[in-house]
Structure formats: structure tokens, C-alpha cells
Regions:
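Short hydrophobic/aromatic-enriched beta-strand-loop microsegments
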Residues: 64-72, 197-200, 257-261, 276-277
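Mg2+-dependent phosphoryl-transfer enzymes with acidic/Ser/Thr/Gly-rich catalytic loops
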Residues: 2-10, 27, 210-293
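Short active-site oxyanion
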Residues: 40-45, 64-65, 173-174, 236-237, ...
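Non-catalytic pre-domain segments flanking phosphatase-related domains
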Residues: 1-15, 32, 39
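Conserved acidic, metal-coordinating active-site core of Asp-based
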Residues: 114-239
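Short, acidic loop-to-helix structural element flanking the phosphoryl-transfer center
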Residues: 24-40, 90-97, 155-161, 218-229, ...
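Short, structured coil segments at secondary-structure junctions
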Residues: 62-63, 71, 192-194, 253-254, ...
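Active-site phosphate-binding/coordination module
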Residues: 25-139
Length: 293
């Protein structure tokens, strides 16, 4: 747990399933709690698997001291004027990018490639992604009703991705794959695990599976270690808040790990404490419980 009496602590907070519910809805208490923690002198960094270009503008508008993106491949420090200073960057070696793409193509697996500036989709992924986003729109409306809001108060943004042909393969840091085969994740872990970090994805696909692939050793936890070293802060005074399997290394790198109420029970078991759900003031309740608000 975090050491008592520290004048300043740092919070690393996931986006999807932690700040955002189903891609676009933010509990008002989350916004006020993060801003209150920063006003109290604590640092708050986003720590997300998304590329920087894919972070919802409403999330950015909350205000943060820095961003770890692409699952730990990139990190920036933010200033009060909105300027960014890049503090870490770990590109996937080109030979690994080629190996990963060949694996997908040979196996008939649909995928997205991530760079710092965007997301690129393989041909044929459109229909599967469109169905996922249709389901997300339905859940978005349900989330708004749960908060007493109308649909037009927080419209769902258009999900934008570019064709694979436009990707600079020398700038790739991560991929997300989608398959109708429920065994594809296990196979990818077995076939690629010698050089890649392969973890379950978060896209709900009945009858299929999906995952995220990054360079072995590049993850949220490794990025947090770099940021803490840069800032001269001890891990004991760091807090990590998340909900999915790409948060495991974050939990291991911080002094206090907080799992969201909707997280997988196995992930909750790895946390120091479990807060409530995203729309049930989960982030706010965690920061209050830790004395940061």
C-alpha cells in the first residue's frame, strides 16, 4: 500500500472501463474527483491502451499531468498550456511488425495496427467492427439513461480508423486482433509469446476472441517505472486504477492497485482494493478512499 504521510502522490488511471463506460460516457463525479486530486497537489496520468490520437476528447478535457498511451509504448508530460513533452517512446522493431502481420495474414485474422498518431484497419475488419460499434451505441444510450441524461447531451463520437495501406510500418507499436475462432487468443500466445506480449482484448465477441499484441517487455507497468524514475517518485506513492488484463503490469508497478467494480474477479484479486463501477462513482470513490480528494 501507499506510504503514509506523503505530500504528493501520483495516480495512473486507465480509460476504457475506468474513466469511460462503453467508449463514451463519463460519470460527472469522475471529472470532479480527478480535478480535485490535481488541485490538492497530486499528479494524475492517463494510462491507456489507446493511441494518443484515439483518446476521447472529453477525456482529455478533464485535464491531466501526463499520458501513457499505446499500452506503454509512448509517454508524454503535459504542461498547463497544453504543451507536450515526450518522455518515452518504444517502437516495435520492424522485423517483429512483419512477423506479426504475416501471422495475421496466414491465419486469416483481422487486425488493427496502432501508431502514435492513429489506428489502421486490415481489409475485411469493417463488418466485425461495425457490429461491435452498433452494440456500443445501444449500450451508450443505456448508460446515459442511467445517469439521467438524454442522448444528445453526450453524443457517441464516430469511430475513425484508416486503411492499413496508409500505415507507416516503421512506426507501429501495437496491434489488436479480432477472430471468429474462440481459440485464436490461446494460439497467438503460444505462437508469438517468445517475442510478444499477448493479452486478452476487451471487445465482446460472442463465439470469437480478440487480443492485444505488443513487444515483449513493453507494457503499462514498464512505462510507469520509467515515468516514476523521471519524476523521482517512489513506486510506494503511486496508485494505479484499471479494469482489464492490460492493467496487470500497472498493478505490479504501483504501491496501491485499484480494480474497478466491473473488472474480472481474477483481476480484482490482484488489486489492493476494489472500488465501485464506472457509472457508480468508481473513480471518485477510490480517490476519496485513498485520501486524495
Amino acid at each position: 500500500m501507499t506510504s503514509p504521510g506523503s505530500p504528493q502522490r501520483i495516480v495512473f488511471i486507465d480509460v476504457d472501463g475506468t474513466i469511460l463506460e462503453h467508449g463514451s460516457v463519463i460519470a460527472p463525479s469522475t471529472i470532479s474527483a480527478i480535478r480535485s486530486a490535481r488541485r490538492a497537489g497530486h499528479l494524475v496520468y492517463l494510462c491507456t491502451g489507446r493511441s494518443a490520437a484515439d483518446i476521447h476528447p472529453d477525456v482529455r478535457a478533464i485535464g491531466f499531468d501526463g499520458i501513457i498511451s499505446n499500452g506503454g509504448a509512448f509517454g508524454v508530460r503535459l504542461d498547463a498550456a497544453g504543451g507536450e513533452e515526450q518522455v518515452l517512446a518504444h517502437l516495435m522493431p520492424r522485423e517483429l511488425v512483419d512477423r506479426m502481420i504475416s501471422y495475421f495474414e496466414d491465419g486469416g485474422i483481422h487486425y488493427f495496427l496502432q501508431t502514435d498518431d492513429g489506428v489502421y484497419a486490415s481489409p475485411g475488419i469493417g463488418a466485425m467492427a461495425d457490429e461491435f460499434f452498433r452494440q456500443r451505441r445501444e449500450r451508450h444510450a443505456e448508460d446515459l439513461r442511467a445517469l439521467g441524461m438524454d442522448d444528445d447531451e453526450a453524443p457517441l463520437p464516430v469511430i475513425a480508423y484508416r486503411p492499413l495501406s496508409e500505415a507507416d510500418l516503421g512506426q507501429v507499436v501495437k496491434s489488436t486482433f479480432i477472430s471468429t475462432d474462440s481459440a485464436s487468443l490461446d494460439r497467438a500466445q503460444a505462437d508469438l509469446g517468445d517475442a510478444f506480449h499477448v493479452i486478452p482484448g476487451s471487445i465482446p465477441l460472442p463465439g470469437g476472441s480478440n487480443g492485444e499484441i505488443a513487444t515483449l517487455g513493453v507494457n503499462k507497468g514498464s512505462a510507469i517505472v520509467e515515468v516514476l524514475d523521471l519524476l523521482g517518485l517512489p513506486a510506494a506513492d503511486a496508485v494505479g486504477i484499471g479494469d482489464s488484463w492490460n492493467d496487470v503490469e500497472m498493478f505490479e508497478a504501483v504501491g496501491t492497485a485499484v480494480a474497478m467494480g466491473g473488472a474480472d474477479p481474477e483481476l480484482q484479486a490482484k488489486a489492493d482494493l476494489v472500488t465501485t463501477g464506472v457509472l457508480d462513482d468508481g473513480v471518485h470513490n477510490a480517490l476519496v478512499r485513498l485520501g486524495l480528494v
